[in-house]
Amino acid sequence: MTLSKTPPRIERFGDITEVIPLPNLTEVQVNSFKAFLQDDKAPDQREDVGLQSAFREVFPIDESEKGRSTGMVLDFIEYRLGEPEYSPEECREKDLTYEAPLYVKLELIHKDTGVIKGFKPDSPPESWVFLGNLPLMTFDGSFIINGADRVVISQIHRSPGVYFTSSYKGIKKQYTAAIIPMPKRGPWIELEFAGDVLEMKVNKRKFPVSLLLRVLGMDDASIRALFTEFTPEVEPGEDKSAGMGADEALLRLFTVLRPGDPPKRDKAIQYLFGLLADPRRYDLGEPGRFKMNTKLGVQRQERTLLKFEDGKFSDAGLVDTIRYLMALQQGLETVPMVDEDGVVTDVPVAEDDIDHLGNRRVRTVGELLADQLRVGMGRMARGVRERMLLGNPDAATPTKLVNNRPIVAAMREFFGRSQLSQFKDQTNPLSDLRHKRRISALGPGGLTRERAGFDVRDVHRTHYGRICPIETPEGANIGLISSLSSYAKVNDLGFIMAPYRKVEDGKVTNQVEYMTADIEDRYTIAQANSPLNEDNTFADERVLARRKGDPLLYTPDEVDYMDVSPKQIVSINTSLIPFLEHDDANRALMGSNMQSQAVPLVRADSPAVGTGVERRVVTDSGTSVVSDVNGRVSYVDARAIQVTLSEDHRELNMNAGNVRTFELIRFTRSNQGTNLDQHPIVSVGDEVKVGQVIADGPASERGRLALGQNITIAIMPFDGFNFEDAICINEDLVRQDFYTSVHIEKDEIEARDTKLGPEKITRDIPGLSEAALRDLDEDGIVRVGAEVKPGDILVGKTSFKGESEPTPEERLLRSIFGEKAREVKDTSLRVQSGQGGIVVKTVRFRRGDEGVDLKPGVREMVRVYVAQKRQLQVGDKVANRHGNKGVVSKIVRPEDMPYLEDGTPVDIVFNPLGVPSRMNLGQILETHLGEVARLTGQKFETPVFDSVTEATIKEMLEVAAAERLQARKDDGFELDKREQEVLDRAGKLGVIDAPGDDYEKGQMQLARTGKSILYDGRTGEPISGPVVVGIMYVMKLYHMVEDKLHARSTGPYSLITQQPLGGKAQFGGQRFGEMEVWALEAYGAAHVLQEMLTIKSDDIDGRDAAYQSIVKGEEVSGSTIPESFKVLVKELHSLGLDVEVLDHGDKAVDIFEGMMPKR
């Protein structure tokens, strides 16, 4: 349990060499936002994505409004981003948004005269139009909105494209086709059979598809040929549109789709164009057209379903979809498809699996932002058209026409209210990283918890290497929120890719290819643990490999690819669990989730048994300081590190000899109230390289993730104190601050202008002693370093009391003798109950200060940060990485804990019954390897699915035991009789062979089992059987009893029910429900029950009287009528039932007296 000064040696196990390192773990966020902005590219080289595509779709704004021509065109040339006004740190401090101004070059062209207004090549910078501020992403992949860190998580949804699914109508299997555009970019179109007729469904309106085919210019013969292509002998269903021309069919179609509107050709063309042919309103998107081309075996470029040229509609994929559906319905295996070039290919026919990851795509932050921007720009464009129509054309300029408010509002709404923009989880570096790699199926345009069935939540074979099959929440969101696998990437179309090593002629190469799920289905892929020879050929004659998810044995020549790493299946959280392959998935899920709830400790200690991923979490999460230069450390203190460069760094515009300064964060509050603190781990003169951690952040030790502590544990019953997952701990853990964490609370108070006069932040508070004000400065703000307890004043504030209107005489006297001192009341900010600690920082914001934006009516605001040191206590939740969790039930003195033969007391006692039924045996192997770490003083890394073998652990335990036995002999110690008895018992139990007289051999055998002889600390007697003892990595979780413990004597009541409020935040009471009432009834506790239902609940007069009796020390009198009874009576009155309340003398009592005016 000691923390050594010199870092221990780390020994790495694992036979599989990984050909590529883990990619940057936040790249899914950073790359997406970079592609959205494209601010590093010249305007003429920007691709049509993100911001650029949003502008290109809205501009030029020139359409006629309600038949009236605008006579002007507003066109877009380019955009640029200005510099952010404040740094991220300043934004966090001042509650600002980290953002940059967005400017656009626009030109206004008059159609009649050809005059161009707005931007000209020689125009000054002021001619750029300001479109509002755009929030920027910080280097670590998060946003700062109103001073708080937020993360925009990626959304997974059904990819646009064409899908063929089946359902049964009676015993007949019927197929349906669905053509899906990009979200909010057009209607879903369904093609299904109604008897023999193929119908099309658009916007919940059905019509025969032949109607639309006639609009596309097809005649009776070509439609008949289409429907009888695969079944020439079968007569097609009745066609009610037979003999119609294109125009007649168009009008008929318009009356079906818009039954209320008069059918006119121009209007019908305009409507159908907007519905399916206008790229601005109907968009399959690049992913949709790609999926459609892949499915139908054609190569089309249009992103709409219909084309409109020369006043006529033509097909862009609808006929191909119908032919494929007909072939599927007829049970054909292939369908001949003709490309635009006239090339015929046979395309395989099959229905789609909608949960296949080839059919689901991820909308990353850049796409979500672009969509939101489109919404804002659409509103802006409507405003521009109105101003064009109503304003003076000669006076119009781009700046006058464009109003940026809709764009600003759309961005504010997205970051502030969207389900996908979330308050960042900053509990520890791992939770921070995990939040950015989250994928949600919920959110706008996605699923809802209630509608999502089992299939969409379930693990699919295509999740392999793309989405973690283990890490997901346990509640209603199970399967809907998931995590990206460790090596997975998202391609430009939004499909998740997994990496594989190419196999050529049975030889595995180091060439790595990333593949989407539908491409992977074409190949046979071997696992990463397939044994290889030195020349990278497969060692076995038959290789276990999978094709379309089915594992089979193949010859080496049949294998196309091989996994790059065993951990590519699981997420980062899950890959941190050692011996994961020995854990049941349900418990591994809990272990993955609980690591993100671990509180950073004051004494960080990286795991004795890790997996090798710990370093990458620290470098990629952004919570530690990582060097971006090569050089030598020239200066170090608690606030900054300076590195003198040893070579040029062109990307930073720095040359060799320049000094790079890294600022450190000290005692900053995270979103969850944990302590963000960085401290240097380099010294002056040290050489540093790019990517090296030079300052540890929270939960980091020498650049390795350190979420918990390496604790000596025993797995044994302990007098019932560890019953039902309760956990006994050694008091030394508390005394030596092993599980002590720092938590920082933020309190703030505003001084407003009120009707009665301005509130004032001051030290001059009426009715308080000097002792109560001892820690306040002259302005009434608590000093930094003061220790505060519940009820202490943090910021002194006074407000004017309300007073009655003065009489004319008083006004006269006041005007003669001057204003009398008006009475003020104390409205100071005090420490809430259950809180307190040391004041670490105070900040004061006044209206008019630079960068300060206070709410209307607020003159100034003071914010106080109070840090609290929390030690481990009874009721705190602790857990290991394998899902074994529990609550501390008893803190035992070290002398009473079980101890080893050398006198070392164990630190934690876990219940053995918590292991077998939960099947998380990884924790036992971790404990055994941890015992080797304890005995040898080193640390180990054992990668998931490539762990150290049990045989190796046994040998290591035996070697360590032999050294320990020899040391005992050298010191003159022999095995005593009590230890011999334990070994004899172990022999009877079958743990070891019966030792006979050879107790030395018995000891060596016992060491191989990972068990030890343990002594009871209270009696000194050995525990009757051998016990598993070793080091386990145990974390303290965010669920601390101090935040949850709550008691109420009196407090606020609900205005409507007059019952106490609920919850700790409202200082509420505990609900006494019907089952609790039954319990008191069962025991006949009549008086207690009456008290619960009356004076402790909603008996207003009774509780007032009881309170007064308690204050005066008198006996509490009986109760009166509770409010809920009065409600019941009124309910019965409303049903027309006359209910009267009678006293003992059968006289009617008016229980509503004084409540309502008499009639």
From Swiss-Prot:
> E.C. number, please?
2.7.7.6
A Pfam family it matches: RNA_pol_Rpb2_7
What name does the UniProt record give this protein? Answer: DNA-directed RNA polymerase subunit beta
What does this protein do, in the record's words? DNA-dependent RNA polymerase catalyzes the transcription of DNA into RNA using the four ribonucleoside triphosphates as substrates.
Q: Which reaction does it catalyse?
A: RNA(n) + a ribonucleoside 5'-triphosphate = RNA(n+1) + diphosphate
Its keywords, alphabetically, are: DNA-directed RNA polymerase, Nucleotidyltransferase, Transcription, Transferase
BP-aspect Gene Ontology terms: DNA-templated transcription
Q: How does it assemble?
A: The RNAP catalytic core consists of 2 alpha, 1 beta, 1 beta' and 1 omega subunit. When a sigma factor is associated with the core the holoenzyme is formed, which can initiate transcription.
Give, as one word, the top-level EC class. transferase
- GO CC, any one term: DNA-directed RNA polymerase complex
Member of which family? Belongs to the RNA polymerase beta chain family.
Quote one Gene Ontology molecular function term.
DNA binding
